[in-house]
């Protein structure tokens, strides 16, 4: 009985901890768990030459605001098939 109770407590702690972690893509298109305080995923455009952009992907607390930028707050929402 004690083992069952301990198992339930451990499972509850693990589930609660995982529920608070946002997962985003980083610039290398790897999945990363965002640190505390970074509650959004973003894809933002960095101009590299006239009319061409490099897209950066990251966890953030405040998103960039541009015509090609994406800001979202669900797991893996900042993936894009668009290339600059």
Curated annotation (Swiss-Prot):
InterPro entries: Snake_toxin-like_sf. It is found in: Secreted. Disulfide bonds join 24-41, 34-59, 63-71, 72-77. This is Three-finger toxin 3FTx-1. The keyword Disulfide bond applies. It comes from the Eukaryota. GO terms for cellular component: extracellular region. SUPFAM superfamilies: Snake toxin-like (SSF57302). Keywords: Disulfide bond, Glycoprotein, Secreted, Signal, Toxin. It comes from Micrurus corallinus. Residues 1-21 form the signal peptide. Its main location: secreted. GO terms for molecular function: toxin activity. Expressed by the venom gland. Belongs to the three-finger toxin family. Short-chain subfamily. The keyword Secreted applies. Glycans are attached at residue 78.
């Amino acid at each position: 009985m004690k083992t069952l109770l301990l198992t339930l407590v451990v499972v509850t702690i693990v589930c609660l901890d995982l529920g608070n972690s946002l997962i985003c893509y980083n610039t290398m298109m790897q999945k990363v768990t965002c640190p505390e305080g970074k509650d959004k995923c973003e894809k933002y455009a960095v101009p590299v030459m006239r009319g061409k952009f490099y897209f950066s992907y990251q966890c953030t607390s405040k998103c960039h605001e541009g015509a090609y930028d994406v800001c979202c707050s669900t797991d893996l929402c900042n993936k894009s098939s668009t290339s600059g």
